[in-house]
Design a protein with these regions (language model features):
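Generic detector of multi-pass transmembrane helix bundles and their immediately adjacent loops
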Residues: 303, 316-324, 331-501
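Membrane-embedded alpha-helical signal segments
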Residues: 1-299, 314-317, 438-501
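Short capping/connector residues at structural and topological boundaries
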Residues: 34, 135, 144, 155, ...
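Interfacial segments of transmembrane alpha-helices in multi-pass membrane proteins
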Residues: 282-312, 328-330, 347-357
Length: 501
């Protein structure tokens, strides 16, 4: 199908050579001189085209009949491509190059360059194009996940963010593996400080073989001794796209189905993409449930230990009797009782994770029931604590990010020990220590507790709640994006009201 460009729309204010120069900043943009002197060149995004189509149906016939090419129109009779656009505009080039076309440039002598667009779109890159988001499951919304091939992951991002401003910087990490690492960001939106920080830290890695993106995170972390994840690991495409559009940086690693999004904040690890696919009130409610679940999971066992060891006078009289009765035959102090049950829960969880899926689920359910019942009958623990620990384990599953869930489980143990040794004072000291540590943490140079500390008004409300889209037109100010607004809600409302009239 041959077409002349005849679209009448607002043109980009720049020349085609300048536009091509801008696109060359991305590592997945490729240029090829068919003729060595540069009179006939080919430009394309490797992540959107099929290399076999280019080699077999474009390059091979052109090289065989170079002498017959006098004008760009001669390409029509040479290549075996149906969809060709002659003399495209800059806007055509922007749209089509990002959609799987290649750009052919011809220059004869002192004549001005002429161009043609030829379709070479890739339909499938590799044997498996997308992965299922098993570890970040959502009931509503897309379930497209990354795979272990970084080129396919770049292709997925290109398909969802169709703009030449999406830039990919390719790096090589690992003295033995030469692992391909790609830093993705949106030019004109992402703050350059975040880009430079991520790039510099990746270049400074001196390691023989980084097997996974999570290893890369530990190398470029602001504090490698912190139990908290500094960058947000995600296998979800929509979550990575949102991070880029919001002014963040996404790091892709060849051989890993996970991307690293940053700068990340503590609140980011309790946000699920599903929040934005539900009505804002439902999304806000579920987010608050996650915050409560994380706090309950972290402190419930420690509070039980502190109250029964030092502060039993705080327990209401009606509740004190059942607690004394349930602990009447338990020979251990509350701190050992709590540690025993917490370790048992962790053993069941780890055993279930290492076994095949169906067997692991059975072990977790049956093992929990049998061991819990046997522990109560053997007077190793009380029924009250058994219920509290079971609810604590259940609450930990509400955290949508595996690494943050693991952090909460780890921190439970020192809090229980402090509560058993010093009571409520020890619990407060443990909380203050965690808070002080969080205040000092940074992600790619950005404070980890943002927008809670330093306080950021509407940004804080947006982190704690899922606000309506009409109130979230701006990008997160604490990321310091170059372009503040994602869209103008007032103009959108005016257009909608105009259509209704």
């Amino acid at each position: 199908m041959f077409r002349l460009s005849s679209k009448k729309k607002k043109q980009t204010v720049c020349s085609i050579p300048e536009f091509i120069h801008t696109m060359k900043e991305s590592s997945d943009f490729s240029s090829y001189n068919i003729i060595e002197d540069g009179t006939l060149c080919l430009f394309y995004y490797k992540s959107t085209v099929e290399s076999l189509i280019i080699k077999r149906f474009i390059l091979a016939p052109i090289k065989d009949k170079l002498d017959e090419i006098r004008h760009i129109d001669d390409i029509l009779n040479i290549v075996s491509i149906e969809d060709i656009i002659i003399s495209p505009s800059i806007d055509d080039i922007r749209e089509k190059l990002l959609g799987g076309y290649v750009l052919l440039q011809l220059k004869k002598g002192s004549e001005q360059e002429v161009y043609a667009l030829l379709r070479a779109e890739s339909t499938v890159l590799g044997t498996r194009l997308v992965n299922d988001t098993e570890n970040e499951y959502s009931v509503i919304g897309p379930k497209v996940g990354f795979v272990e091939n970084v080129d396919i992951n770049i292709h997925l991002l290109r398909r969802n963010i169709v703009t030449e401003q999406l830039i990919f910087k390719e790096l090589s990490v690992g003295s033995m593996s030469k692992t391909k690492i790609v830093v993705a960001y949106i030019e004109g939106i992402t703050n350059e400080q975040h880009i430079n920080t991520a790039t510099q830290r990746l270049q400074d890695i001196d390691f023989d073989y980084p097997f996974d993106a999570t290893m890369i995170e530990q190398f470029i972390s602001d504090n490698s001794n912190s139990p908290f994840p500094i960058l947000l690991p995600t296998e979800r495409l929509d979550r990575s796209v949102y991070a880029l559009l919001n002014g963040g940086v996404v790091i892709l690693t060849d051989g890993s189905p996970y991307a690293l999004a940053g700068p990340a904040t503590l609140l980011d690890f309790f946000v699920s993409p599903e929040d934005y696919y539900l009505p804002w009130m439902a999304g806000s409610f579920l987010r608050l449930v996650r915050f409560f679940g994380a706090a309950f999971s972290l402190f419930s066992s420690a509070i039980y230990t502190a109250v029964l060891t030092y502060h039993y006078q705080m327990i209401p009289a009606d509740l004190l009797g059942p607690i004394i009765y349930s602990r009447a035959n338990v020979p251990f102090p509350p701190v050992l009782e709590a540690l025993f049950l917490e370790i048992t829960i962790e053993l069941l969880r780890e055993a279930g994770a290492r076994l095949p899926t169906k067997v692991g689920q059975t072990i977790g359910i049956v093992g929990g029931i049998v061991i819990g019942q046997a522990s109560v009958e053997a007077a190793l623990t009380s029924t009250i604590l058994l219920i509290a620990v079971a609810l604590s384990a259940l609450a930990s599953f509400t955290t949508p990010t595996v690494k943050m869930s693991s952090t909460i489980r780890i921190l439970r143990f020192p809090l229980i020990i402090l509560a058993g040794a010093f009571g409520g004072v020890g619990l407060i000291v443990g909380f203050v220590f965690i808070l002080a540590h969080l205040i000092r943490l940074k992600s790619l140079g950005s404070p980890y507790l943002l927008p809670l500390y330093p306080f950021r008004g509407l940004g804080t409300a947006e982190g704690l709640l899922r606000l309506p889209f009409s109130q979230t037109a701006g990008r997160a100010s604490f990321l310091r994006p170059k372009k503040k607004w994602r869209y103008n809600p007032n103009k959108a409302k005016e257009k909608r009201d105009g259509e209704e009239k």
